[in-house]
From Swiss-Prot:
Alphabetized UniProt keyword annotations: Acetylation, Mitochondrion, Ribonucleoprotein, Ribosomal protein, Transit peptide
Residues bearing the modification N6-acetyllysine: 228
Organism listed in the record: Rattus norvegicus
Localisation per UniProt entry: Mitochondrion
Family affiliation: Belongs to the mitochondrion-specific ribosomal protein mL46 family.
GO cellular component labels: mitochondrial large ribosomal subunit
UniProt key word Ribosomal protein: yes
In-chain residues carrying the UniProt-annotated modification N6-succinyllysine: 217, 246
Cited InterPro entries: NUDIX_hydrolase-like_dom_sf (IPR015797), Ribosomal_mL46 (IPR040008), Ribosomal_mL46_N (IPR021757), Ribosomal_mL46_NUDIX (IPR033650)
Name of the protein in question: Large ribosomal subunit protein mL46
Length: 277
């Protein structure tokens, strides 16, 4: 009886030793596979800010839109109920008819402003009203550094930065720092631009696009190939961007004007996440 039990225990012990050897081997394999991941990537990480000024006025209507708007306005007038002012005008018309028929007490008319008097007053105020011009002084001068241009379009902030021996236009960007999120990097960009107290609303925590570029050959190495840039969108709420002593180093460009500044490959990636509704 003791012999079978001893053989069983001996088999269990051998099984544990084999399992231990397999576990040790797999641990060494895992440590060897994990070792390369601890080495530094040859690509730097950066966050970029796509800061947009939304439209301040609506776009002009096309002829088809004007025709449709007129049709809808006509339908609205025909199907709508009378307003308080219209009911008052109808009541005054009835009283005027009674007055002509000598069935109306004139004492009820004392110190009462008629609806027609109000309409005449409103008409005078309307004639004195002058709407603001759709075309600003910056539009006339084609001053793209001004935020007060193309009021019916989205405008995007571009800055001119020196990369190696080249001056390139791009969205504002800074290098990612260990310990911060990529959105935190984008928020840090806004903080550096906020000398003029700009406030903006970020649209989400995830990047809306990315771009990868290599450094110029003069500064490129095997351990430092280039930069991977992650874009974050934000809408400008208040403030303006002014660079003291750096005239011509920034522009507020519309979507159609981006091609005048950005490199083709960079522009292709930026246009993928831009919507101009």
């Amino acid at each position: 009886m003791a012999a079978p039990i001893g053989r069983t225990l001996l088999g269990v012990a051998k099984g544990w030793r084999q399992l231990d050897r397999l576990w040790a081997g797999s641990s060494r394999g895992l440590s060897l596979e994990a070792a390369p991941s601890s080495s530094r990537s040859p690509w730097r990480l950066s966050g970029a800010l796509c800061l947009q000024r939304p439209p301040l006025i609506t776009k002009p209507l096309t002829p088809l839109q004007e025709e449709m708007a007129g049709l809808l306005q006509q339908v609205e007038v025909e199907r709508s109920l009378y307003s308080d002012h219209e009911l008052r005008a109808l009541d005054e018309a009835q009283r005027l008819a009674k007055k002509k028929a000598d069935l109306y007490d004139e004492e009820q008319d004392q110190d009462v402003t008629l609806a027609q008097d109000l309409e005449d007053m409103w008409e005078q105020e309307f004639l004195q009203f002058r709407p603001g011009a759709r075309e600003t002084e910056a539009d006339k001068k084609n001053d793209r550094t001004s935020l007060h241009r193309k009021l019916d379009r989205n405008l995007i902030l571009l800055v001119r930065e020196k990369l190696g021996d080249q001056d390139l236009w791009m969205l504002p960007q800074v290098e990612w720092q260990p310990g911060e999120t990529l959105r935190g990097t984008a928020e840090r960009i806004l903080a550096t631009l906020s000398e003029n107290n700009m406030e903006a609303k970020f649209l989400g925590n995830a990047p809306c696009g990315h771009y990868k570029f290599k450094f110029p050959k003069a500064i490129r190495t095997e351990s430092d190939l280039g930069v991977k840039v992650f874009f974050f969108k934000a809408l400008l709420l208040t403030g303006d961007f002014v660079q003291t002593g750096k005239k011509g180093r920034h522009v507020w460009a519309s979507k159609e004007e981006l091609g005048d500044y950005l490199q083709p490959k960079y522009l292709a990636q930026v246009r993928r996440f831009l919507l101009d509704l």
